[in-house]
């Protein structure tokens, strides 16, 4: 870790704030490093990607799992390859349901520490189940088991993130977004690379700058008891991650939920009352956006929630009919790029809500029952 890596400049004096703020710089550092590794990456990946029946699973635990939820749909449609997202927590408990020995597998394991018991076990199970198995761990910790095991394996290529993304705060912030950007750059370099992604970094930097010292809050302050994040497609993954940030940093004092706008009508909408904040991540795709705006207008007509906020790249009559945030000006972003912008608001909201509720964001679990690196997991050996 660099000697000058301190939270001294953070208004809140927390690692969490520092780690939120340095994200745009960390992304460009990582993608520049991937540029330098491109030849070695291609040597490893190109023979695999030529296999017609190759399965590519994006995996991780908790926030690391949500990376796959956010980017796998776009990677699958963009590349035509068989990308899917399966958490390590599912791979470990039900390997027989997800690991098919008849198909070669590339397992992309995301991990901040690289030491989560399920992450290490998932790699071992994949090797055990699938005769032709390859690994691309993307991790923030050079000393972690994911990285160390991979550099000593013939069937793996280890991708290490910049040291500052190994977040010291409890919640994953710069770690998730840097691993996410890096994976996109690996598999879609013509769209996501160190040059094109500067637009994303600049827009997110503008968001963070616009929030000043964070003291005003992102969505204001009100006595809400629950928050719901809504997003379509991969943005539902961003909504899920946004909800988890609130749960983690407030230690569950603010109940948080997520769904897709269309799915929300099918029962979950029952939770909305006059103590509920609803945040809608509006898609940049003109077709999908219609569904987001339909639900946004419906929630406002219902007049049941305390506040319904839209975050969108551009305004419209429906967006502007109530509380809303318009992203800073930039070129057109596809949703997988826009997800980074939405996460800037969500991370900052969770941080400030934590402080507002009297929590310590870097160590929010006063009881110690929830840990930065998960503890208490017993890994049981597979028996066919």
Curated annotation (Swiss-Prot):
Organism: Escherichia coli (strain K12)
PANTHER family: D-GALACTOSAMINE-6-PHOSPHATE DEAMINASE AGAS-RELATED (PTHR32502:SF3), N-ACETYLGALACTOSAMINE PERMEASE II COMPONENT-RELATED (PTHR32502)
UniProt catalytic activity: D-galactosamine 6-phosphate + H2O = D-tagatopyranose 1-phosphate + NH4(+)
UniProt domain SIS: residue ranges: 45-197, 215-364
Coiled coil location: none
Physiological role: Catalyzes the isomerization-deamination of galactosamine 6-phosphate to form tagatofuranose 6-phosphate and ammonium ion.
Protein name in the entry: Putative D-galactosamine-6-phosphate deaminase AgaS
Stated family: Belongs to the SIS family. AgaS subfamily.
CDD domains: SIS_AgaS_like (cd05010), SIS_GlmS_GlmD_1 (cd05008)
Lineage: Bacteria, Pseudomonadati, Pseudomonadota, Gammaproteobacteria, Enterobacterales
UniProt-listed NCBIfam families: agaS_fam
Keywords from the UniProt entry: Hydrolase, Repeat
